[in-house]
Design a protein with these regions (language model features):
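Outer membrane beta-barrel strand-and-loop segments of large Gram-negative receptors
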Residues: 77-83, 234, 238, 253-319
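Exposed loop/turn and edge beta-strand positions of beta-sandwich/beta-sheet ligand-binding modules
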Residues: 21, 78, 143, 183-185, ...
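Surface-exposed loop and edge beta-strand positions of immunoglobulin-like domains
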Residues: 138, 192, 206, 238-240, ...
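Surface-exposed loop/turn segments flanking beta-strands in extracellular/periplasmic regions
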Residues: 2-8, 56-67, 103-133, 182, ...
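Feature captures outer-membrane beta-barrel proteins of Gram-negative bacteria and organelles
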Residues: 185-193
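Surface-exposed extracellular loop regions of Gram-negative outer-membrane beta-barrel proteins
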Residues: 47, 104-106, 169, 179, ...
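Face-selective signature of the C-terminal outer-membrane beta-barrel domain
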Residues: 14-174, 178, 194, 299-306, ...
């Protein structure tokens, strides 16, 4: 508000363009002994560009520009994966393979504000503002060799064991330079036991590594907060991971009447990732994705989905 009872008006113009494409394919060959070779590839690209301009609407009907924000990014991803599956013994098979992924982000951000200084046509005729990490190229090369063993112990029990080793290199160039290597070992055990045809017990143990969103590395626009025009990037961001311990029991009601399940699980988080305060002053409010440390989470969950057969409405499910 311009005064106690005097409203002020602003207008924003936010044109943008988006384009994307993806191509992929797979091939599978089965040998005479029953073994299988599979390979696949995926290549995609996402191009985004937006320009945000804000104008003060003056009392006489004219307008005065006070913000120019231009964001352009190109995200490319290329993945290739190959694996070989063979039968070991009766009820057991083993799949071994490797995956390679390349991800590239080119990001550019320009901010112009009304104020004292030399205006620039490339900044909408406003005064250019310096933004840390505004022009950046980020590239990741990741390899994942893996082995997956499936064992049908008997007609009621099965066990899946997988071992994955993830190694990656992330290099950032442009306004900032940073190059880092990450290595993670990701085991998984998934045990299932059909106590009865209706009652199943599942025990799961695994290590989960959450991939970093490349947009968190670079400065970006913030269209949800008028008090903060840009979101800061974090060149030192690390992937977070957690150990997952999960015990699940599921009971299927007779006559396909529904499902009741109980789930108890624990997460042990490391380098947990969320937005953190990186404001430089009380008037320059900023946030960025960051690693906040370790923690534990316990969850007990009960679920039920029941068909309303007793009300002669078998197609209605109450959850």
């Amino acid at each position: 508000l311009g005064g106690a009872n005097t409203p002020s008006w602003e207008r924003e113009d936010i044109p943008g363009t988006k384009s994307n494409w993806e191509i992929g394919g797979d091939y599978e060959y089965q040998f005479n002994n029953g073994s299988r070779f599979k390979t696949l590839f995926i290549s995609n690209e996402n191009d985004n560009a937006t320009t945000r301009e804000r104008f003060d609407v003056l009392a006489g009907g004219g307008e005065e520009k006070n913000l120019y924000l231009n964001m352009a990014s190109v995200l490319k991803e290329r993945i290739v994966r190959g694996s070989y599956t063979m039968d070991l013994f009766d009820g057991q098979d083993l799949e071994i393979g490797i995956e390679r992924a390349q991800t590239i982000l080119d990001s550019n951000l320009r901010l112009g504000l009304a104020g004292t200084g030399l205006p620039s046509a490339s900044h909408g005729g406003l005064v250019p503002e310096d933004i840390s990490n505004a022009n950046t190229n980020v590239e990741e090369i990741r390899y994942e060799p893996f082995a997956i063993h499936n064992w049908r112990i008997n007609s009621r029990m099965s066990l899946e064991t997988s071992l994955v080793y993830e190694t990656s290199e992330i290099e950032q160039t442009g306004d900032l330079y940073n190059k880092r290597d990450f290595n993670f070992f990701r085991p998984k055990l998934d045990y299932r036991f059909d106590i009865t045809p209706q009652l199943q017990l599942r025990a799961l143990f695994e290590k989960i590594v959450r991939q970093i969103s490349f947009s968190d590395f670079v400065a970006a626009t913030d269209s949800d907060d008028n008090d903060s025009n840009t979101l800061a990037g974090n060149a030192d961001l690390r992937p977070d991971y957690w150990w997952n311990y999960n015990l699940l029991a599921e009971y299927r009601l007779p006559s396909d009447a529904g499902v009741v399940s109980a789930n108890l699980y624990k997460h042990e988080h490391r380098d947990f990732r969320q937005r953190i305060d990186v404001s430089t002053s009380d008037t320059d409010l900023r946030s960025a994705a960051g690693n906040v440390g370790s923690g534990e989470m316990w969850v007990a969950e009960l679920k039920a989905s029941v068909r309303l057969n007793m009300l002669s409405m078998p197609n209605v499910v109450l959850t």
